């Protein structure tokens, strides 16, 4: 991928959200502002449709909304840290780390590779702790790039 999967402008370290839909929308707005999504409302509808199929909460305080969409220009990952937590349907409670994967409609392979690589890292408490402890968007983007993005 020539465009980085994640950059600091796609990270919200102090995300305050009322629910998962609000958290997702705020991350979509970051993608839109960065020019990675052409229609924020359209992509939001695609993410909602995917969420309606199955909850995307994972154990360990993780929300992992994702969708392929014609409104996405390049595979991207936006991250939000939500101190108060947001319910993404995980059995162990609210998510404090939210990862929004956005992939172009034609990007089946990219979407699955990103999802698989991220899921492999998220099972490790040390990875989740490093992200939780990171104080800046630069730190979060660096950790994700180092640990998730294939070299």
What are these regions (language model features)?
Residues 1-151:
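Cytosolic covalent-transfer regions centered on His/Cys nucleophiles
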